[in-house]
Amino acid sequence: MKDFFKNVAATIVGLFAFGLIMTILGFICIIGMVASSNSKPALKDNAVMVMKLQGQIEDRTEDNWLGELTGEQFNNIGMNRILSSIRKAKNEDKVKGIYLETGILETDYATLQEIRNALADFKKSGKWIIAYGDALSQGGYYLASVANKVYVNPEGNVDWHGIASQPQYIKDVAAKFGVHFTVVKVGKYKSYTETYTEDKMSDANREQVSRYIGGLWLQMLGDVSKSRNISKDSLNRYADGLMVFDDTKLLKSRKMVDGFCYYDEIRDVVKKQLGLKADDTINQVDYNDVDMTIDDSNLMGEEIAVYYCQGSIVRMETPSIYDSEQQIVSTKVIKDLQELADNSQVKAVVLRINSGGGDAYASEQIWRAVKELNKKKPVVVSMGGMAASGAYYMSMGDQYIMAHPTTLTGSIGIFGALPDFSDLMTKKLGFKYDEVKTNRNSTYASAGMSRPWSAEEIATMQNYVNRGYSLFRNRVAEGRKMSTEQVEKIAQGRVWLGTDAKKIKLIDGFGGLSDAIDKAAELAHLSSYQAVEYPALAGWMEQLLDMAGGNKGTYLDEQLRLALGDLYQPFIMIRNMKEKEPIQAALPYVLNIQ
């Protein structure tokens, strides 16, 4: 019997050792694959940079190694990498032009505009851009239209339909499950809560949405009209007529494209542009590899920190196994900004913000950290597709603010959506509750679960929101050098397009991320400088450990995006409903711009 237990123990130890060895070998294989994928050939002369863009474009993204290994990756593209590659290709003599291929792009119009402006700047160097698509989405065509030549498949199409917003309302759906909502808010334009309490747009919401989507469309019309030499009236007529279903041949006569070719034939077009013969090989470099193949002579001088803030503003990180949405975690951001303030090597900071806001308390704490940072060194805010409500709040520390004409900003207001699940719990599911308490409001924490919200609780929450709005308004007045009366006229939760925001002094100037970096250098009196990105991105090992601990939902989130399509955003909205802090300084609704 003793020998039996020895053999069992030896077997267990052997199996454990074998498993450990296989795990180590697996990690070595992964490291090898990552290392081999990072090994890029030297750039050859007479080269073309290939840009194939499809998927979701964000300001900055982590490399998703798990998706790459499984081959089931939903493309998340970093705008910072796109802009860097275009700039480097412009300054590299070996790169003669760009081949641009666009598919379905999921991003905001300000991001598209920033990339488009970078491509236009690339052309100013005398280099060319050739764009191609089997079928071009509206966003894809907006990018492609800046090219010298645009080609489409002979049986392809161009989707050009204008812009629409279709908010979703869940009041009746929620009521079927015994769920109701009570709203406390300040601001007639603060219409986020309409999603839960109404079945259509309010007049105020319709007014602001009409204003800014009309402004977005005018920007697109102007840019495409100038690049393609097509009148705005013609472009509007094409959008009205469901051009995506028209005969493809009409695209050339309408000057939307320059020609037609199949995918294999576009190579011949590029060869001709490079002066190559039919049997010559094209020297090409993928835009993702440019950082490793082109030396950047601009990486010298004093350091300007570019700190990225993307996603919802929260007090503490709220991880999920199936949602990879980025978050602006106030505790982490404050710590990072304090470190940048104390870092003598950092001479200025660019705060890159792309957020619809979030927790009001967290926004106030970040506001103070930014203000304290600005006392030690210049801070410039660079607004992406949106920097609204809480994201605008945190920008009010007296610093210079830059945005795009198509940025959505403002939304100075606060709301609270108080969900009431008591009918679901007691009438639908049959839960029973009883209580013993020492004071009148001892059970306030269970309001909306065991019982409806009381009139006293609702009134107290409304007073709380009123104080928060007053503080928000005062922060804006102080930061923008305005009176509270002036702020009130442009507040009330209203969302403003960048073009209007500059007129009413919510921002200081127009420009993209590179312009903001240049402005920070100017304010810091720097003649030579380099931009360094913060916070540091997680490596593959950190991503693995996070996923093992249930702290990242990147992979499962990608599967949800692919499976749900247009239903993804409503699903996430409903799932997050109960997790949010009750008082929010957030964009007045979930954006749904088509």
Q: Where in the sequence are the language-model features?
A:
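Cleft-lining beta-strand/loop regions that shape enzyme active-site pockets
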Residues: K40, A47-P167, S297-L424, N466
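Active-site proximal loops enriched in glycine and acidic residues that flank catalytic Cys/His/Asp
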Residues: Y308-G311, I353-S355, M383-G385, P405-T407, ...
